[in-house]
Amino acid sequence: MLTLLAILVVSYIVGSIPTSLIAGKMLKSIDIRDFGSGNAGGTNAFRVLGWKTGLTVTLIDIIKGVVAAVSVVAFFRHHPIDVFPDINEVALRLLAGMSAVIGHVFTVFAGFRGGKGVSTAAGMLIGIAPVSMLMVIGVFLLTVYISRHVSVASILAAIAFPLIIAIRKYLFELGAGLDYYIKLFNAKFFFHDSLDYHLIIFGLIVAIAIIYTHRANIKRLLAGTENRISFGKH
């Protein structure tokens, strides 16, 4: 029990690192929450700090999710405080990753006012199901390129994830042959691509949550007032 608690606490602290706030303070001496949408996430960093900084912030937030779902769990597997949790591996990684997402949204380092958790959730899922997430990232990037709305891309990518897992698992069984190449590079633990049913359930919950956290963006999209990002600045 103590080991599970430690995993959740450390993952929360990792997720709580306020990347966009640090970038805003370092680059412009501002609190990014006072500008744009008022959110401390990657989307607002794109708007306020430019696409290069926004991309950097997003990548770091993604890494936070990967670290929580993979590295934190791996560390405590080899250095448990008491008995290592006897639960489904994917479920454990999801718990650690979600703790990081909660940390990102309710960061202890910034008055519990953080981002929306999209990038950190994406990082968590990259650590668990990298092949499926490559497809989801493709959906995200294509949508950003076409629409110039990161919010739209985030929503569509969230919806795409459980659909892709379900299609791969129950219709095509894509990616099963990857194990040979994974073992060849001796990286099966890190890059193991799961199609566990927990991911479908979790993906549906996350999709609903992301749609809910983007409700203000959806209102602005319907009103035609949602800001677009530009690839020609900064």
Swiss-Prot record:
Identify the Pfam families for this entry. G3P_acyltransf
Primary localization class, coarse: membrane
Protein family according to the UniProt entry: Belongs to the PlsY family.
| Gene name as annotated | plsY
Q: Where are the transmembrane segments?
A: 4-24, 56-76, 90-110, 122-142, 152-172, 191-211
The domain of life for this entry's organism is: Bacteria
EC id: 2.3.1.275
The protein's name is Glycerol-3-phosphate acyltransferase
Q: Is Transmembrane set as a keyword in this record? A: yes
Q: Which GO biological-process labels does this protein carry?
A: phospholipid biosynthetic process
Compartment(s) of residence: Cell inner membrane
What Gene Ontology cellular component terms go with this record? plasma membrane
